[in-house]
């Protein structure tokens, strides 16, 4: 599946809370403060809403606000304000807290996946080869140096050698899985699976967290509809 999880996710575009990034930087992750990553957020997006110095306008990824303005939403906003929850017109802007309309990676009715935004425009380049129906099994090492990768293509195992670098972008699940299968990770985990240890790195495969997403259901005599024809 080209585009990875961006081709199957819920299409909601959320940068994350500024405090989280700043906390990472305070913990020693230099270069991960919100001010550090903001230029990259701006560079990647083409925001179709109100302009702001915090939003990008010329990036490859189209970001839109849901166009549906059901009357029910006005009641939700009013209820939130009565509970002292502020209405936030852009939760990817100055403040991240509050209630507001969802921003999505949808443009003119089409999902704006990483494949649509980044890969499709350049797939005709002569120095780019896209191999589908393939699964990376593990990285190949000569001592501590990564020299290639083992790939399963349909029913064949193929070894690819590299002369420069490998960028591992398998996502929150597959990236640590590939590292562990390659011998990089917690010693006890690898020994349990009889995987030779290349590099002990205790953080690999640990501390995965997902966001909280409470669901609510309401009943009304009003006609409800939803459209994503942005």
Please state what every model-predicted region is.
Residues 132-145:
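A conserved short coil-to-beta-strand element within the FAD-binding core of flavoproteins
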């Amino acid at each position: 599946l080209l585009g990875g999880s961006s081709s199957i996710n819920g299409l909601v575009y959320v940068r994350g809370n500024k405090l989280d990034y700043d906390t990472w930087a305070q913990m020693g992750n230099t270069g991960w403060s919100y001010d550090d990553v903001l230029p990259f957020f701006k560079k990647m997006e083409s925001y179709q809403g109100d302009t702001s110095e915090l939003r990008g306008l010329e990036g490859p990824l189209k970001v839109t606000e849901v166009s549906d303005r059901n009357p029910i939403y006005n009641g939700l906003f009013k209820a939130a304000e009565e509970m002292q929850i502020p209405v936030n017109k852009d939760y990817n802007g100055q403040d991240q807290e509050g209630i507001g309309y969802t921003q999505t990676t949808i443009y003119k009715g089409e999902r704006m996946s990483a494949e649509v935004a980044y890969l499709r425009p350049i797939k005709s380049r002569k120095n780019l080869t896209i191999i589908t129906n393939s699964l990376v099994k593990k990285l190949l090492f000569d001592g501590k140096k990564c020299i290639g990768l083992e790939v399963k293509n349909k029913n064949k195992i193929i070894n690819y050698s590299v002369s420069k670098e490998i960028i591992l972008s398998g996502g929150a699940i597959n990236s640590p899985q590939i590292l562990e299968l390659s011998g990089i990770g917690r010693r006890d985990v690898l020994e349990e699976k009889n995987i030779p240890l290349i590099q002990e790195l205790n953080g690999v495969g640990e501390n995965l967290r997902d966001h909280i997403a409470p669901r609510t259901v309401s009943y009304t005599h009003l006609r409800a509809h939803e459209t994503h024809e942005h």
